């Protein structure tokens, strides 16, 4: 698996230091090494990351934290990514939160139903592709400052 780390963005770093509100990403991934890599990618891109090691933990964190977007692995113990998506879509307070589903299994965007994810990315996902997908769903970091 080839992974690329994005260069740190000076403007993003500067705005983070100045205390501006950053987009909060709930990241649910059971593979510890991949979760840590994705945390670094997202933090370097200017996002605040709330990590979860499985879908059940992610569900609890979504209920107790204000999140702007959820990135979840499709296959996890306790509660998989599809079940997490269904829970979010059926929640009165979380139904509006965009969800990106990550999977090592091939899936077409047309296979995504409304009660599931807003976007699908195949693993391994590059840092550029992940950030582009977030920006497509939420808008670029620079436009939110």
Protein language model features and the residues they cover:
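Active-site residues of response regulator receiver
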Residues: 73
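Conserved acidic carboxylate
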Residues: 29
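Short hydrophobic/Thr-rich beta-strand motif most characteristic of the beta2 strand and flanking loop
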Residues: 46-53, 61
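Receiver (REC) domain active-site loop signature in two-component systems and cognate sites
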Residues: 76
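Non-catalytic signal-transmission and effector/linker regions of two-component phosphorelay proteins
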Residues: 1-24, 128-145
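Charged docking surfaces used in two-component/phosphorelay signaling
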Residues: 36-44
């Amino acid at each position: 698996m080839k992974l690329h780390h994005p260069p740190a963005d000076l403007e993003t770093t500067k705005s983070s230091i100045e205390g501006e509100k950053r987009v909060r990403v709930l990241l649910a991934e059971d593979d510890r090494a991949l979760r840590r890599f994705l945390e670094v990618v997202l933090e370097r891109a200017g996002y605040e990351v709330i990590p979860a090691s499985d879908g059940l933990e992610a569900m609890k964190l979504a209920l107790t934290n204000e999140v702007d977007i959820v990135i979840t692995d499709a296959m996890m113990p306790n509660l998989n990514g599809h079940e997490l998506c269904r829970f979010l879509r059926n929640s009165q307070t979380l139904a509006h939160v965009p969800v990106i589903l990550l999977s090592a299994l091939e899936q077409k965007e047309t296979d995504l139903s409304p009660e599931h994810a807003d976007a699908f990315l195949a693993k391994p996902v590059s840092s550029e592709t992940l950030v582009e997908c977030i920006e497509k769903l939420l808008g670029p970091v620079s436009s939110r400052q």
